[in-house]
């Protein structure tokens, strides 16, 4: 079995709008390759991040209905930061919807927010010394 997860697909309605949003919150585009028939292979990640998000333009009613609901209503994307204040301000400037105020938990500083399509994210600055 592979030793790591390389990509996670995120359904979006439009590649360019998604790229614009993710660039505004500090992600970088690692690849944007045309595949024909309007399909692209678009990989994004936070700078220095290992795992990547593959932006997938929804095709058909089933996929379109899943945009923003891939986590089934749960927080399911957990970017970890080394500078909570910087990234919180970046999210705020990008106009995300915050569901909570920033708070301290036993594992770190967190805030729950939604992207433009409704996906729930949890920005975390881990403060535990026993990460593993």
Description of each model-found segment:
Residues 1-7, 25-80, 86-116, 124-132:
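Vicinal oxygen chelate
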Residues 11-15, 37-38:
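Conserved beta-strand-loop-alpha-helix junction that forms the acyl-donor binding cleft
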Residues 14-29:
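Amphipathic alpha-helical segments
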Residues 15, 84-85:
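Residues at or immediately preceding the N-termini of alpha-helices
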């Amino acid at each position: 079995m592979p030793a790591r997860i390389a990509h996670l697909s995120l359904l979006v309605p439009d590649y360019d709008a998604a790229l614009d949003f993710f660039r505004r919150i500090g992600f970088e585009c690692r690849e944007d390759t045309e595949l024909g028939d309007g399909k692209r292979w678009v990989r994004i990640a936070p700078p220095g991040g290992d795992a990547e998000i593959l932006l997938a333009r929804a095709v058909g009613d089933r996929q379109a209905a899943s945009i923003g609901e891939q986590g089934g209503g749960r927080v399911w994307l957990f970017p970890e930061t080394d500078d909570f204040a910087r990234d919180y301000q970046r999210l705020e400037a990008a106009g995300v919807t915050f569901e909570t105020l920033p708070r301290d938990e036993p594992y770190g500083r967190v805030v729950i927010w939604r992207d433009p399509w409704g996906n729930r994210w949890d920005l975390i600055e881990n403060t535990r010394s026993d990460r593993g």
